[in-house]
Amino acid sequence: MTTDTIVAQATAPGRGGVGIIRVSGDKASDVAMAVLGHLPKVRYADYCDFKAADGAVIDQGIALYFKGPNSFTGEDVLELQGHGGQVVLDMLIKRVMDVDGVRIAKPGEFSEQAFMNDKLDLTQAEAIADLIDATSEQAAKSALNSLQGEFSTQVHELVDQVTNLRLYVEAAIDFPDEEVDFLSDGKIAASLGKIITKLDSVQSSAKQGAIIREGMKVVIAGRPNAGKSSLLNALAGKESAIVTEIAGTTRDVLREHIHLDGMPLHIIDTAGLRDTTDTVEQIGIERAWAEIETADQVLFMVDGTTTDAVDPHDIWPDFIDRLPKNLGVTVVRNKADLTGESLDATDEQGHKVFRLSAKTGSGVDELKAHLKSLMGYQSNLEGGFLARRRHLEALELASSHLALGQEQLEVYQAGELLAEELRMCQLALSEITGKFTSDDLLGKIFSSFCIGK
């Protein structure tokens, strides 16, 4: 870990009412003596002059001094809060760097120091960047919950439960004559079942948190000329796709990134799905299926003039049977302006069915509201947390180890192999909070932060 003292502008570049310079490290007190002429009282706001080496006043403002470990980074920290002119702030940084041993901070280095000094775990550090980047009230609140440790607490609870069960299993292994009794008395199976249930719950919350942070991928799919491109244009609010009466106009994947009340949504328009001998169209259809397989939700676009059916299995059973398991499907009966259908939404065989006209826009707002609800918009605004792709991958890995461990217990009565799967599960979960994390991953995470954070 670095022993350098670091400095950076903590406020955004450019003009502003207030500009803040942050200093962290052993030399923070030396910087205070050089720039202020005295060391401010710890945790008190001190209004004073910020001076150049020759004693000339660079600016006037408030100095705050925090003695480590009682600071954000866990080190001595000095904050100089002055006027927000960029020239003044640059002059002040240059003055701070006159002190030997002080250098410009790397992106995210203040947060990295806080992590290294156990002031934050990795999910809390990531939440700082997510809070800054939040595009909706929901995302901001969820990021704040993560910063306050809601996600970390749930992960720590899981790690503790896995660790305790592992110790119990290893104790059984230490007494080989009694190992079979230990493994078959039901206590281990019950404990393992509770952990799996808890992990499933955390995974579900994390997936919702990832959608709030990263956006939901929605693929519009269906037969040619069902109105898929018209729906893309209606959702995007602009003419993104060419729309004609000719079937097969869309031959490639079209993407639009939009926000619904701040909630990020990735909309994918695809080629119409059908049997064809056209080589180019076949490629487009293959790409359509590739997008469907990685989607969070599919909008199954149906030309309402061709069928009265609302159950997707009745409309096109082969299409539904090919979809990935657990992929959400919303049926969109289009061309209500021609069929005269009422613009309402119903539940049919576990699927939401919307009736609308992509051409006129009637009923599209109701579909947008549905998509927002799928992303968790205003759903339990006080709860929830944000999650990243790496968190989901770690939770999935932990879940797979628990499943293998359950198999070792129930099928093979193999205590040592169960203990090993529990150990691997423990490592996967601990990587989320940064207890066991590679330096390469840490570098990648913190380098994406703002300088000064």
Swiss-Prot record:
Record: residues binding K(+): 225, 244, 246, 249
Domain TrmE-type G: 215-376
Residues bound to GTP: 225-230, 244-250, 269-272, 334-337
Keyword Transferase: no
Membrane-crossing residue ranges in chain numbering: none
Transferase recorded as keyword: no
InterPro entries assigned: G_TrmE, GTP-bd, GTP-bd_TrmE_N, GTPase_MnmE, MnmE_dom2, MnmE_helical, P-loop_NTPase, Small_GTP-bd
Subcellular location, record wording: Cytoplasm
Binding site for (6S)-5-formyl-5,6,7,8-tetrahydrofolate: 22, 79, 119, 453
Gene Ontology terms: biological process: tRNA methylation; tRNA wobble uridine modification
Enzyme Commission (EC) number: 3.6.-.-
Main location: cytoplasm
Keywords from the named record: Cytoplasm, GTP-binding, Hydrolase, Magnesium, Metal-binding, Nucleotide-binding, Potassium, tRNA processing
Any one Pfam family match given in the protein's UniProt record, by short name: MMR_HSR1
PANTHER family per UniProt: TRNA MODIFICATION GTPASE GTPBP3 (PTHR42714), TRNA MODIFICATION GTPASE GTPBP3, MITOCHONDRIAL (PTHR42714:SF2)
Function text: Exhibits a very high intrinsic GTPase hydrolysis rate. Involved in the addition of a carboxymethylaminomethyl (cmnm) group at the wobble position (U34) of certain tRNAs, forming tRNA-cmnm(5)s(2)U34.
Family: Belongs to the TRAFAC class TrmE-Era-EngA-EngB-Septin-like GTPase superfamily. TrmE GTPase family.
Record's protein name: tRNA modification GTPase MnmE
Organism expressing this protein natively: Shewanella loihica (strain ATCC BAA-1088 / PV-4)
